[in-house]
């Protein structure tokens, strides 16, 4: 089946997430050590987890829940017993610089984008996180000029699996749900969110194993499973 539009998730869909996250953490730890923090990796991981946990608890469902600068702002305050704005800024900047330096597209992404372009298919990226960070990722991956639209949870005010990121993209592209396919790695935010809107869904996990259908509720089950990103050409183009 061909589609008039494909809505891609970004993180752990177009590129593997885990090595980038690890590179970002190493860079942030180095930045904090340069500022005089005597942290081993275990202490850093505890600081990061504390900041992340507090941020998720208080900002869940918003793009801010993913902000590494907020994680470090809160984590450093708990660790040091007082705020350290400069340290949080340095660690957050170092994290994203290290993260982006490690990024690379999954095999097959460029070929799929070529096929979709040749077929005249609209291509959007619909993603949870802040707009500036996601723009940096698209530029780093070299696909910023290959997509027709970026929609972030920050700009629409709601996170997937809310319908709003999906419907905002469809409205901008002037496409109906029946004309579009959503592709992502997360069975809740990507697959269940797309299914609820009436989009066809495809599950592709760039880094890690996809859960079996038997482990999923009906609303989390994708219409298509992709073992390799290049398989999308047969599904969508």
Residue spans for each PLM region:
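A broadly conserved amphipathic alpha-helix scaffold signal in soluble, globular proteins
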Residues: 73, 114-117
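Extended, well-ordered alpha-helical scaffold segments
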Residues: 87-91, 118, 146
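Asp-based, Mg2+/Mn2+-dependent phosphohydrolase catalytic module
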Residues: 1-6, 18-19, 114-115, 122, ...
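N-terminal helical cap/lid subdomain that shapes the substrate entry/recognition surface
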Residues: 3-110
């Amino acid at each position: 089946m061909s589609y008039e539009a494909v809505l891609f998730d970004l993180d752990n869909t177009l590129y593997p997430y885990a090595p980038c996250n690890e590179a970002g953490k190493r860079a942030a730890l180095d930045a904090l050590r340069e500022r005089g923090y005597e942290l081993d990796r275990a202490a850093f991981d505890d600081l990061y987890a504390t900041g992340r946990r507090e941020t998720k608890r208080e900002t869940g469902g918003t793009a801010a829940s993913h902000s590494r600068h907020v994680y470090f702002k809160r984590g450093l305050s708990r660790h040091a017993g007082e705020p350290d704005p400069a340290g949080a800024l340095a660690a957050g900047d170092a994290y994203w610089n290290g993260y982006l330096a490690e990024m690379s597209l999954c095999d097959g992404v460029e070929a799929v984008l070529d096929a979709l372009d040749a077929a005249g298919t609209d291509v959007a990226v619909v993603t949870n996180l802040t707009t500036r960070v996601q723009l940096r990722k698209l530029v780093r991956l070299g696909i910023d000029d290959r997509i027709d639209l970026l929609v972030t949870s920050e700009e629409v005010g709601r996170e997937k699996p809310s319908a709003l990121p999906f419907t905002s993209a469809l409205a901008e592209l002037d496409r109906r749900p029946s004309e579009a396919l959503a592709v992502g790695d997360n069975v809740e935010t990507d697959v269940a969110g797309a299914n609820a809107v009436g989009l066809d869904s495809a599950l592709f996990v760039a880094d890690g194993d996809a859960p079996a259908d038997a482990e999923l509720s009906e609303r989390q089950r994708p219409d298509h499973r992709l073992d390799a990103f290049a398989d999308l050409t047969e599904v969508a183009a």
